[in-house]
Curated annotation (Swiss-Prot):
Pathway: Bacterial outer membrane biogenesis; LPS O-antigen biosynthesis. [2Fe-2S] cluster binds at residues 37, 42, 45. The lineage of its organism: Bacteria, Pseudomonadati, Pseudomonadota, Gammaproteobacteria, Enterobacterales. Disulfide bonds: none annotated. It comes from the Bacteria. This is Protein RfbI. Keywords: 2Fe-2S, Iron, Iron-sulfur, Lipopolysaccharide biosynthesis, Metal-binding. Pfam families: FAD_binding_6, Fer2, NAD_binding_1. Its cofactor is [2Fe-2S] cluster.
């Protein structure tokens, strides 16, 4: 059975079956509601239920006035939701295309830069910041796209997760010209048009979508002030010199690496990466912040930044979770 689902304040509607999540129904209808992990872990798809009833994956029933996760809840009745909708993504169509490995380079002890080439007529048409699903040998995992356009294929940053199915395949046997498949574009993490200064907050391979977005801004000769905070446990884990190069070549780009572990060789900033932001700015009222990393980092930074006058409408995030199909994107 299907029900009409209305989204406010954009005043759009679509049909959703009782056996599919609200988010899946929306995406099938070409309506891009805000989301990231699609597994119920990141909380980014949280919406206000204005009318109707839904059931979540555990069988819990929610009604009017409740907050729900659209990736986990299915409609029991007609619904009205207060949820974010992105018309910028309306023209995108998710597709699956073949690709071959161009190169697979180990750039740190546990991170590999994977570059894939697609057929000239099989582009996915992503926005900088979005991600793809990588399919190989019956395993599917999600990875953020690390380059800003498809002219040179697709670049991914893959961390070697202990017992990770996909990362074990990639680190163990991948060779040049290996045939794989990618599905995308996915996600609602992309740059919003604005003249506000930007803070990028990255943890680990959360640098991948940040790289994509910063490259896009630089190529477009953006004059907004750009601050890149990149956190790692140890200084040896920083696997790219690009942020430092950007800061040296562009006077509006500022790079602040932060180390959280006990690292005797590190003479720079120490502690949690979002604490460095807190220390550097008295107020975040006029900033746009893009955060990409673990759900713990994103939750902590969002709460703390709001104490520095950041409006929740100007906090954009993409959480790398270890559940379901994105365990190797941490």
């Amino acid at each position: 059975m299907s029900h009409i689902i209305k989204i406010f304040p954009s005043n759009i509607e679509f049909s959703g079956r009782e056996d599919e999540s609200i988010l899946d129904a929306a995406l099938s209808a070409g309506i891009h509601l805000e989301h990231s992990c699609k597994a119920g872990d990141c909380g980014i798809c949280e919406s206000d239920l204005l009318a109707g009833e839904v059931v979540d994956s555990k069988g819990n029933i929610f009604g009017q006035g409740d907050k729900i996760l659209t990736c986990c809840c299915k409609p029991k009745t007609a619904l009205e939701l207060n949820a974010h909708f992105f018309p910028e993504l309306a023209g995108q169509t998710k597709k699956i295309v073949p690709c071959k490995v161009n190169s697979a380079v180990l750039v740190s002890g546990d991170v590999m830069t994977l570059k894939l080439r697609t057929p000239p007529t099989a582009k996915i048409g992503f926005l900088p910041g979005q991600y793809i699903n990588l399919h190989y040998k019956g395993v599917t995992r999600s990875y953020s796209i690390a380059n800003s356009d498809e002219s040179n294929g697709i670049e991914l940053h893959v961390r070697n997760v202990p017992n990770g199915q996909m990362s074990s395949l990639i680190f163990g046997e991948l060779q040049e010209n290996t045939l794989m498949r990618i599905e995308g574009p996915c996600g609602t993490f992309f740059i919003r048009e604005s003249d506000r200064p930007i803070i990028f907050l990255a943890g680990g391979t959360g640098f991948a979508p940040v790289k994509s977005m910063v490259e896009h801004l630089i190529q477009g000769k953006c004059r907004r002030e750009i601050y890149i905070y990149w956190g790692m446990q140890y200084s040896k884990d920083f696997y790219s010199a690009l942020p430092q190069q950007w800061s040296e070549q562009h006077d509006n780009v500022h790079y602040i690496p932060v180390v959280s572990g006990d690292d005797a060789e590190w003479g720079g900033r120490k502690g949690f990466v979002h604490h460095a932001v807190m220390d550097d700015f008295d107020s975040l009222e006029f900033f746009d912040i893009y955060a990409c990393g673990s759900p713990v980092m994103i939750d902590a930074s969002k709460k703390d930044f709001m104490m520095k006058n950041l409006s929740v409408e100007h906090f954009y995030s993409d959480a790398f979770t270890a559940s379901n199909n994105i365990e190797d994107n941490l």
